[in-house]
């Protein structure tokens, strides 16, 4: 496990939860995750769940993605998706507003790996360098990804070679995130 990435993710999650506590006097609330089982759920309302991060309990790797392509995935991606269970978190990096994707449960982790495989299949078909997404943006065709060749974090337009460098590594990126509520 990449300790710098794990700590940066835990630190951002703490900043996010602290900001939520300060503004709402509660743990983060999600309507999107209502009805989806998770160890993160601390209480449920009529149409939403309150959640708090929990330690990841599964196998701490994305080996299914590696096996599907017979490639080695950046260690930071293994760490990013297997440090904790948590709800997705809204954040800002510079002037970019994003939703940082998280693993909600072991079932969700399997789905995330399937989506990463699908993403890599498309990139391979289009002969694009491999990236692995970590966040979504308001613009549906743009994501924040980690380049599997260099480990750098970029803003990417799906299906194209258009990429903008954001950070040299995932820990640096996570350390610069500001929570958005």
Curated annotation (Swiss-Prot):
Keywords: Cell inner membrane, Cell membrane, Membrane. One of its GO terms (cellular component) is cytoplasmic side of plasma membrane. It holds the Pfam family Syd. InterPro entries: Syd (IPR009948), Syd_sf (IPR038228). Transmembrane segments: none annotated. CDD domains: Syd. It is a peripheral membrane protein. Disulfide bonds: none annotated. It is found in: Cell inner membrane. Interacts with the SecY protein in vivo. May bind preferentially to an uncomplexed state of SecY, thus functioning either as a chelating agent for excess SecY in the cell or as a regulatory factor that negatively controls the translocase function. NCBIfam families: PRK04968.1. Belongs to the Syd family. This is Protein Syd. It comes from Escherichia coli O17:K52:H18 (strain UMN026 / ExPEC). The gene is syd.
């Amino acid at each position: 496990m990449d300790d710098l990435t794990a700590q940066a993710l835990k630190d951002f999650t703490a900043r996010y939860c602290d900001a939520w506590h300060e503004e709402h006097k509660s743990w983060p609330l999600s309507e999107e995750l209502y009805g989806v089982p998770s160890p993160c759920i601390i209480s449920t309302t009529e149409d939403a769940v309150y959640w708090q991060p929990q330690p990841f309990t599964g196998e701490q790797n994305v080996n299914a993605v590696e096996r599907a392509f017979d490639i080695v995935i950046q260690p930071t991606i293994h760490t990013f998706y297997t440090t904790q269970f948590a709800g997705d978190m809204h954040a800002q990096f510079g002037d970019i507003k994003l939703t940082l994707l998280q693993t909600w449960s072991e079932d969700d982790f399997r789905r995330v790996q399937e989506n990463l495989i699908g993403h890599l299949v498309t990139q391979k078909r289009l002969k694009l360098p491999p990236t692995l997404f970590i966040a979504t943006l308001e613009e549906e065709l743009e994501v924040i990804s980690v380049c599997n060749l260099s480990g750098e974090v970029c803003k990417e337009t799906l299906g194209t070679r258009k990429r903008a460098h954001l950070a040299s590594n995932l820990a640096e990126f996570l350390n610069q995130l500001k929570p958005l509520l």
